[in-house]
Amino acid sequence: MAFAETFKALSDPVRRQILELLKKGALSAGEIASHFDMTGATISYHLKILKQADLIFESREKNYIYYQLNTTVLEEFLLWISTLKGDTSNAERE
């Protein structure tokens, strides 16, 4: 996992808001954009950064692309954070 990309992706408040939206389920780019006062191109840029960090993935359904959280990467990130604070109970289980 490339933590540098993860931190970069999480550093922007718009991208964090997009992740919050996606925790409820898959959304199209248009559905995501409807929650923001910015251009579709700007939303696409933020989605690209989130995809590069593997925080989201896309699936195609007919003419639409839907975006979803990649919980695997989030779990790896949280596990790494927990080892930093000395909580090894999760790491010992694996």
PLM segments and residue spans:
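Amphipathic alpha-helical dimerization/coiled-coil segments
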Residues: 1-2, 8, 73-94
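Alpha-helical residues within the helix-turn-helix
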Residues: 34, 45, 51-52
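Short, low-complexity interaction segments enriched in Ser/Thr/Pro/Gly
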Residues: 5, 45-48, 59
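DNA-recognition element of transcription regulators
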Residues: 41-43
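N-terminal helix-turn-helix DNA-binding core of bacterial DNA-binding proteins
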Residues: 2-39, 61-73
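Solvent-exposed, charged/polar functional surfaces in cytosolic regulatory/catalytic domains
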Residues: 13, 50, 76, 80
